[in-house]
């Protein structure tokens, strides 16, 4: 069974994971003409 502690850990992990995916997706699909030095 999943208790409150596991549920909080899963929610926190998913939040961080999805946030990281969004950041990575933004940097990959950002304006290709822009080159960061």
From Swiss-Prot:
It comes from the Eukaryota. It is found in: Endoplasmic reticulum membrane. InterPro entries: Oligosaccaryltransferase, OST4_plant, Ost4p_sf. Residues 29-37 are cytoplasmic. One of its GO terms (cellular component) is endoplasmic reticulum membrane. Residues 1-7 are lumenal. Keywords: Endoplasmic reticulum, Membrane, Signal-anchor, Transmembrane, Transmembrane helix. It is a single-pass type III membrane protein. Pfam families: Ost4. Its main location: endoplasmic reticulum. Component of the oligosaccharyltransferase (OST) complex. Belongs to the OST4 family. This is Dolichyl-diphosphooligosaccharide--protein glycosyltransferase subunit 4A.
């Amino acid at each position: 069974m999943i208790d409150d502690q596991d549920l909080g850990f899963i929610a926190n992990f998913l939040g961080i994971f999805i946030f990281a995916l969004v950041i990575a997706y933004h940097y990959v699909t950002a304006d290709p003409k822009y080159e960061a030095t």
